[in-house]
Amino acid sequence: MMDRIVMEVSRYRPEIESAPTFQAYEVPLTREWAVLDGLTYIKDHLDGTLSFRWSCRMGICGSSGMTINGDPKLACATFLADYLPGPVRVEPMRNFPVIRDLVVDISDFMAKLPSVKPWLVRHDEPPVEDGEYRQTPAELDAFKQFSMCINCMLCYSACPVYALDPDFLGPAAIALGQRYNLDSRDQGAADRRDVLAAADGAWACTLVGECSTACPKGVDPAGAIQRYKLTAATHALKKLLFPWGGG
């Protein structure tokens, strides 16, 4: 196996340039090195000005989302050896404003996420002495896969609807709202309806499915969105047929 590989890294330094450029770096190559290891080597040994996000290095925190050879990937879970003989082109996630180099502005996602109330909503609280809220394995399975989301935002980078319409609520936010709607302990489905069923919510999705393909945790946001469309349509039909109490 080759012992070196070239990484072409997108650089954007707003104080000295008006648009991103690419800079090539040659880094050591071992089978164990992820793209994040290559970037860390560049920062530590070749160019300390390179900026990028990372935290856990284990594909859990979701911090290292980037565009690698054109695909939305976690840099910590994507290996340099898979791109031999190179080069490996590393760019920021798409559909987000670039702050510097590989660092993007995620404030739009962070502002939208609370709107779906991604937490357990209870309108009645049983006495503490009644104990915890118990679930059967089947009740857990109903929402478990959607709870695996790590907020890496790769689904937003992959989503053609979000690329065209930044007002779109987006795959992860809708899937997380649906995660709690499907939780037997939650009572907040009606509280989320105005946001999830809005024109910029689930109905804006055109079911391209790139979000589900991009998810590093196997979450199916596209499936969650289509299921919610059915829920929203059923509710709307009930309201039409039974306006005095259609739920």
Swiss-Prot record:
2Fe-2S ferredoxin-type domain location: 14-94
UniProt enzyme class: oxidoreductase
GO biological-process terms attached to the record: anaerobic respiration; tricarboxylic acid cycle
Pfam families: Fer2_3, Fer4_8
Domain called 4Fe-4S ferredoxin-type: residue spans: 140-169
Top-rank taxon, per record: Bacteria
GO cellular component: fumarate reductase complex; plasma membrane
Cofactor(s), names only, from the UniProt record: [2Fe-2S] cluster; [3Fe-4S] cluster; [4Fe-4S] cluster
Catalytic activity field: a quinone + succinate = fumarate + a quinol; a menaquinone + succinate = a menaquinol + fumarate
An MF annotation (GO) of this entry: 4 iron, 4 sulfur cluster binding
Keywords: 2Fe-2S, 3Fe-4S, 4Fe-4S, Cell membrane, Electron transport, Iron, Iron-sulfur, Membrane, Metal-binding, Oxidoreductase, Transport, Tricarboxylic acid cycle
The enzyme's E.C. designation: 1.3.5.1
Paired cysteines (S-S): none
Binding residue positions for a menaquinone: 12, 226-229
InterPro entries: 2Fe-2S_ferredoxin-like_sf, 4Fe4S_Fe-S-bd, 4Fe4S_Fe_S_CS, Beta-grasp_dom_sf, Helical_ferredxn, SDH/FRD_Iron-Sulfur, Succ_DH/fum_Rdtase_Fe-S, Succ_DH/fum_Rdtase_N
Topology versus the membrane: Peripheral membrane protein
Residues annotated as binding [2Fe-2S] cluster: 56, 61, 76
Positions bound to [4Fe-4S] cluster: 149, 152, 155, 215
Cofactor: record remark: Binds 1 [2Fe-2S] cluster. Binds 1 [3Fe-4S] cluster.
Residues bound to [3Fe-4S] cluster: 159, 205, 211
Subcellular location: Cell membrane
Complexes and interactors: Fumarate dehydrogenase forms part of an enzyme complex containing four subunits: a flavoprotein, an iron-sulfur, and two hydrophobic anchor proteins.
Family, similarity comment: Belongs to the succinate dehydrogenase/fumarate reductase iron-sulfur protein family.
Protein name: Fumarate reductase iron-sulfur subunit
Native source organism of the sequence: Mycobacterium tuberculosis (strain ATCC 25618 / H37Rv)
Gene coding for it: frdB
